[in-house]
């Protein structure tokens, strides 16, 4: 086991991506993947898996603040199931509440409104999801 994990912040237009190391508990953003109504270019995901060879994949699970599911929750689950089905890699879902808010805040502090492009926000959210996963001791 390499200790490498990939995280995805699922969205219908853009899917944020991050790579992280279990040993350091840190993650960094990778370029976001464009999606057509939630469907990514599966060839890009396959290339990411070949390049990084993750032990597992973490997919952010969008929930309402009270923990109930929202319309995007089922689609994120479906995305996670498709990754597992296509590539046979372990996939776990992780609560992503407020990850986008935190990502926007951090990017804004770094570069103002110009830093808030959609792909950067989505991949920064994926970093937050993965680091949160590490912080919970996984």
UniProtKB/Swiss-Prot annotation:
Entry GO CC: cytosol
Xref: SUPFAM superfamilies: Ribonuclease H-like
Function: Could be a nuclease involved in processing of the 5'-end of pre-16S rRNA.
Localization per Swiss-Prot or TrEMBL: Cytoplasm
EC number(s) from the headed UniProt entry: 3.1.-.-
Disulfide bonds: none
Name under which the protein is recorded: Putative pre-16S rRNA nuclease
Native source organism of the sequence: Shigella dysenteriae serotype 1 (strain Sd197)
């Amino acid at each position: 086991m390499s200790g490498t994990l990939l995280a995805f912040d699922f969205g219908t237009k853009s899917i944020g991506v991050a790579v992280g190391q279990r040993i350091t508990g840190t993650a960094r953003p990778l370029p976001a993947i464009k999606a057509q109504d939630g469907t990514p270019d599966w060839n890009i995901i396959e290339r990411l898996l070949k390049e990084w060879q993750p032990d597992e994949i973490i997919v952010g699970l969008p929930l309402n603040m009270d923990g109930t599911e929202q319309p995007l929750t089922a689609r994120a689950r479906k995305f996670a199931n498709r990754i597992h089905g296509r590539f046979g890699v372990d996939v776990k879902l992780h609560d992503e509440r407020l990850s986008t808010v935190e990502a926007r805040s951090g990017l804004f502090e770094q570069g103002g409104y110009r830093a808030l492009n959609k792909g950067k926000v989505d991949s920064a959210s994926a970093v937050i999801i993965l680091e949160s996963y590490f912080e919970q001791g996984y």
